[in-house]
Amino acid sequence: MPNRKASRNAYYFFVQEKIPELRRRGLPVARVADAIPYCSSDWALLREEEKEKYAEMAREWRAAQGKDPGPSEKQKPVFTPLRRPGMLVPKQNVSPPDMSALSLKGDQALLGGIFYFLNIFSHGELPPHCEQRFLPCEIGCVKYSLQEGIMADFHSFINPGEIPRGFRFHCQAASDSSHKIPISNFERGHNQATVLQNLYRFIHPNPGNWPPIYCKSDDRTRVNWCLKHMAKASEIRQDLQLLTVEDLVVGIYQQKFLKEPSKTWIRSLLDVAMWDYSSNTRCKWHEENDILFCALAVCKKIAYCISNSLATLFGIQLTEAHVPLQDYEASNSVTPKMVVLDAGRYQKLRVGSSGFSHFNSSNEEQRSNTPIGDYPSRAKISGQNSSVRGRGITRLLESISNSSSNIHKFSNCDTSLSPYMSQKDGYKSFSSLS
């Protein structure tokens, strides 16, 4: 069998360049073949002129190997896993949004700024070699500001079109494990062109510059691809500036506090479950069917998390438009019955109940002799004059310790114990037995 060395194309050199970054992220990539599955989405977002750099590297490698490309090889297009000829592919933008315009007017401009949070669900993700990577089935978007909270929302189900041959089971399994939207014959699904036009009217009702749109960084590849796919299907060409919510929060913190929070903290801020089942968060269909995954709910929970974290720092009073107040107040309240500071606190509560009234007078007398000093109001100070703490066995052990110097007198404890416990006029500590 001949020992032929595989040819290297532009995609090979792109993956080779990404390997150090993948290793820094902790991914198990030892060679190019291991890194290929992690690079297909990034490759699809490159523009044609950016891919030309790697194509030139491939030509130089072939020339060095003595493999000048023939006529058929020169005409062969560079393999693009996610790109269809003529489809608009955006340039990946991972830099934080420009907040300099807001800095000129201070906090008021930042509080009044309008942000749009967008998410698009799909019936799973098809393998990289497929021309159609996603099948959009649901879209959600909210209009939000720090001052007003959620001002408006947009939601629609999308007709995904024809399921690629051989992937029906794959798409059905992906749907059943998440949003549970039927993959076919769903009467609520709308034409992709109609949905995209309605989305454009929602985010850009008046002439002028288009506002930036934000989504989670983990969803950006899917949302970007679906927008361009729907734009091509409807022949509507409009470049939307799709940024990440994480970068938005970084920009707000830098503008307000001149500090940059860590991306790990921001992701933990956005990935919370306290509003998963809050009322008026999911769409009507997911709410009625008690399904957790909803594109509109993802957008609203982003707004809730930002309000919960940033609104109080700007001195904004939270309203129903910022967070679901009934769930917010419940999550911040504490049931008094579950709070037991210490045994003394627990016993103090029992003293006031029936059956312990004969302890009141002596307890008040002992508490009046307790030095306060600089200790907190609920702190207990050990010593001979401190208030009674803990259970009876604790007091007995303390009395034994205090009377260790007079141990010969403690032998009479059994005979003198009964008279002290039978007295009706109050309570005397065991330390008096000595």
Curated annotation (Swiss-Prot):
GO cellular component, one term: perinuclear region of cytoplasm
Tissue distribution of the protein: Testis-specific. Expressed in various cancer cell lines, probably due to demethylation of its promoter.
Subcellular localization, as worded in the UniProt entry: Cytoplasm; Nucleus
Taxonomy, superkingdom: Eukaryota
This protein's record includes keyword Chloroplast: no
Keywords: Cytoplasm, Developmental protein, Differentiation, DNA-binding, Meiosis, Nucleus, RNA-mediated gene silencing, Spermatogenesis
GO MF entries: sequence-specific DNA binding
Alphabetical GO biological process terms: cell morphogenesis; ectopic germ cell programmed cell death; fertilization; homologous chromosome pairing at meiosis; intrinsic apoptotic signaling pathway in response to DNA damage; male meiotic nuclear division; negative regulation of apoptotic process; negative regulation of developmental process
PANTHER family to which the protein is assigned, alphabetical: PROTEIN MAELSTROM HOMOLOG (PTHR21358:SF4)
Subunit structure: Interacts with SMARCB1, SIN3B and DDX4. Interacts with piRNA-associated proteins TDRD1, PIWIL1 and PIWIL2. Interacts with TEX19.
Protein family per UniProt: Belongs to the maelstrom family.
Protein name as annotated: Protein maelstrom homolog
Annotated organism of origin: Homo sapiens
Source taxonomy: Eukaryota, Metazoa, Chordata, Craniata, Vertebrata
Gene encoding the protein: MAEL
